[in-house]
Design a protein with these regions (language model features):
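Short S/T/G/P-rich N-terminal loop/turn motif that feeds into the first structured element of a domain
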Residues: 1-52, 59-70, 79-114
C-alpha cells in the first residue's frame, strides 16, 4: 500500500473564517487522539484569511478512510464555511476510490517521481 496525500482548498464565505478555525481546532484534537495512520495534517491560511488549504499525508488508503470516519461529524459544518475543492494524490485503493466517487474530489495518480 502506498502513501496518500490530500489537499483541500477553501474560499471562505464572508464572516466564516473564525468558525472554520474553531472547527479545525476540534478536527486537530480528533486527529491527534484517534488517527493512527495520519502522518501529517497541516492547515494553512493566506495573509488576509480569505482562503485556506488543508494538507494531509496518510500511510495508506485505509488511514484516509479511518480519518474520514473519525472526523465525519465535523465535516458538514466545516464545508459550510466556504466553497471547497479537494484532491487525493497517490494510488488509492479501490475502496477509497469508491468512497470518494461523486464527492467532487479529484484523484491524481503518479506520473513521474524520483
Amino acid at each position: 500500500m502506498s502513501e496518500i496525500q490530500g489537499v483541500a482548498r477553501f474560499t471562505f464565505h464572508e464572516g466564516k473564517v473564525e468558525e472554520f478555525k474553531r472547527l479545525c481546532a476540534q478536527v486537530m484534537d480528533v486527529v491527534r487522539a484517534k488517527d493512527i495512520g495520519t502522518l501529517q495534517y497541516v492547515i494553512y491560511l493566506n495573509d488576509d484569511q480569505s482562503e485556506g488549504v488543508v494538507y494531509e499525508r496518510y500511510q495508506n488508503s485505509e488511514a484516509v478512510i479511518e480519518h474520514a470516519t473519525h472526523v465525519g461529524d465535523l465535516m458538514e459544518a466545516i464545508f459550510a464555511t466556504g466553497s471547497v475543492s479537494g484532491e487525493l494524490l497517490g494510488e488509492p485503493s479501490a475502496e477509497l476510490t469508491a468512497a470518494t466517487a461523486g464527492s467532487g474530489v479529484s484523484i491524481f495518480r503518479p506520473f513521474l517521481s524520483m
